[in-house]
Each structure stands twice: as structure tokens, then as C-alpha cells.
């Protein structure tokens, strides 16, 4: 049985305005939304890219707590989106290094996409290293996901078969916990934890200040009205 909460339809969404019962509830919402950029002051800049949109929520489970940007390529990324990505990395060029952690299927196209991302970003002038972390042959041997026949219609199939044989494997076949742990380990390896903790502490103080305002909202309003 699959839990209904595990099924996501990303193409059909109810849209509408947000509402609050009282003004102080807006402050509570702001406190929840108040986040500092955990990569401020870091020597490295990191993004996580995944081949398939179907896996973007699983990737997000790792990236959101790490405050790390993540992106669904949906196959070969469009030229316009690749240009936009290059501009992001160029904007981060003051840092020591920029990295993309890339996850994709182990098939002719999935393997080639890592190369494609690297080369097209370089073409647009971005100095970034694309690190493929999944799916790899070591992971296939470790977790033994079910194989599929390599697509003979793929123009990259010949080179793939010469190197890996006539079987391919999908990233989806890995347990979500394996994917999230893999991303967490890769991202934190590029992060200075001392700098990260300093930003977290500053963020916590900001949230505490907002909570104090929220709790004393009526008194704050009364004071402001008395000053009018």
C-alpha cells in the first residue's frame, strides 16, 4: 500500500490568497519564514541538480535542511535555463570554488548529462565543477537495483555498451534515505561548519526577537498608539 500523502501531482494546484486571523499571526508567519543564507561567508557555493522531476521532492528533503539550492533538470536542461544557471555561478565567482552535485540515471543519456552540464556552463563562462554522485557502478553493486535494457535507440548507446554493457539502471530505484544521505554527506563536505554554525546562531537570535514581538504585540500596539 502507498500512502496518499506520498503521491504528489505537481501539475494541478489550488491557488489563492493567504489569510491570518489576527495581525500578530503575520509576525508568527514571518518568524517561521525568517531564514539567513547559510552559505554567506562560505568559501564554496554548492547546488544540487537531479535529472528527474519525479525525484525533486526527495532531493529537497536533503537540501532544504541544508539550505542548499536544488534544481530539477528534467532531462537535458534547456539552453535558456543553462544560461541562467551560468549567471548564478558567475555571480558566485568571488568564492574559492563552485560545485554542482549531480544525480542521474545510469543509462546512455543519464551518464552523458553530467558532461553536457559541465561543458555548456563552461561555454557560458561559468567556472564550476560538476560532480556526479549518483547513479554510479559502485552504488549499483552495493544496492543492487533492478536493471533495464539499455535503450538501443539512444545515439549514445554504443559508447555506453562498450563501457558498461547492455544494462541500465534508474536513480529512482535507490531508497530515498540512500539519496538523502548521499546528498547530505556531499554537501557538508564542501561546507565550513564553524561559519555555518555562526550564521545559524544569528538566525536563531532573530527568530527569538520576532517571537518576543509576537508575544507582546498588544503592548507594542498600545505603546505606539500612546505616542500618536
Regions found by a protein language model. Name each.
Residues 1-98, 111-228:
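Nucleic-acid enzyme cleavage-core boundary/entry regions
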Residues 107:
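Catalytic metal-binding/acid-base residues of hydrolase active sites
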Amino acid at each position: 500500500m502507498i500512502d496518499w500523502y506520498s503521491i504528489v501531482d505537481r501539475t494541478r494546484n489550488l491557488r489563492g490568497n493567504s489569510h491570518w486571523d489576527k495581525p500578530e499571526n503575520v509576525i508568527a508567519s514571518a518568524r517561521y519564514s525568517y531564514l539567513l543564507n547559510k552559505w554567506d561567508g562560505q568559501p564554496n557555493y554548492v547546488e544540487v541538480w537531479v535529472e528527474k522531476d519525479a525525484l525533486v521532492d526527495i532531493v529537497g528533503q536533503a537540501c532544504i535542511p541544508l539550505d542548499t539550492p536544488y534544481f530539477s533538470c528534467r532531462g537535458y536542461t534547456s539552453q535558456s535555463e543553462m544560461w541562467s544557471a551560468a549567471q548564478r555561478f558567475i555571480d558566485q565567482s568571488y568564492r574559492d570554488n563552485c560545485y554542482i552535485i549531480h544525480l542521474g540515471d545510469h543509462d546512455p543519456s543519464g551518464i552523458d548529462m553530467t558532461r553536457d552540464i559541465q561543458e555548456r556552463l563552461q561555454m557560458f563562462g561559468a567556472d564550476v565543477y560538476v560532480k556526479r554522485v549518483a547513479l554510479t557502478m559502485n552504488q549499483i553493486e552495493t544496492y543492487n537495483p533492478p536493471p533495464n535494457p539499455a535503450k538501443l535507440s539512444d545515439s549514445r548507446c554504443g559508447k555506453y555498451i562498450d563501457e558498461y554493457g547492455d544494462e541500465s539502471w534508474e536513480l529512482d530505484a535507490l531508497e530515498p534515505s540512500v539519496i538523502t544521505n548521499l546528498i547530505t554527506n556531499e554537501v557538508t563536505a564542501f561546507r565550513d561548519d564553524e561559519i555555518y554554525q555562526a550564521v545559524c546562531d544569528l538566525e536563531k537570535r532573530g527568530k527569538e526577537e520576532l517571537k518576543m514581538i509576537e508575544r507582546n504585540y498588544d503592548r507594542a500596539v498600545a505603546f505606539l498608539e500612546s505616542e500618536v
